[in-house]
């Protein structure tokens, strides 16, 4: 990533970018943030779009917040096909080829996700959903006494 011409980031004049690591060239629209000061989850929730490698954490946070994800292929990651397939199926992701990423050819990806906007956030009440499902199973098996 050090070989990338990061100053070209300024070509995206309508966009402000922030990241956790310094980048060469000091583009005016890049802002370095600290994990100590900003939680990763809050950064995703307050972003219009996330540009990242795909993984369980970023996938889950993007779904929970309705934040579109522009991601890079991860053929070395066993779960990549499942996560990428889910992003494609939900319409909330955009796979950016490595060449376009490294050449900062992000126009199409940004325009595509911007035109779709944020999606409806996914419910994050998994514990309550699981408890309700367990109660349904107990009721359906006639063990109502276990619920009182």
Model segments located where?
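Nucleotide-sugar donor-binding patch of glycosyltransferase catalytic domains
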Residues: 35, 65-113
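Surface-exposed, flexible loop/turn segments at secondary-structure boundaries
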Residues: 23-25, 58, 77, 101
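C-terminal amphipathic helix plus adjacent low-complexity
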Residues: 107-148
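General structural feature for long, well-ordered alpha-helical segments within catalytic domains
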Residues: 4-5, 9, 83, 126, ...
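A donor-sugar binding/catalytic signature common to diverse glycosyltransferases
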Residues: 39-82
């Amino acid at each position: 990533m050090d070989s990338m011409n990061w100053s070209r980031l300024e070509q995206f004049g309508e966009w402000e970018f922030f990241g956790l690591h310094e980048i060469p060239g000091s583009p005016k629209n890049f802002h370095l943030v600290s994990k100590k000061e900003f939680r990763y989850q809050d950064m995703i929730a307050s972003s219009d779009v996330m540009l990242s490698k795909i993984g369980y954490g970023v996938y889950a946070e993007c779904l929970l917040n309705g934040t579109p994800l522009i991601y890079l292929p991860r053929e070395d990651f066993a779960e990549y096909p499942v996560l990428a397939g889910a992003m494609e199926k939900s319409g909330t992701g955009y796979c950016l080829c490595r060449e376009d990423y490294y050449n900062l050819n992000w126009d199409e990806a940004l325009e595509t996700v911007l035109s779709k906007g944020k999606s409806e956030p996914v419910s994050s009440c998994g514990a309550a959903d699981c408890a309700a499902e367990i109660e349904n199973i107990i009721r359906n098996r006639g063990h109502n006494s276990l619920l009182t």
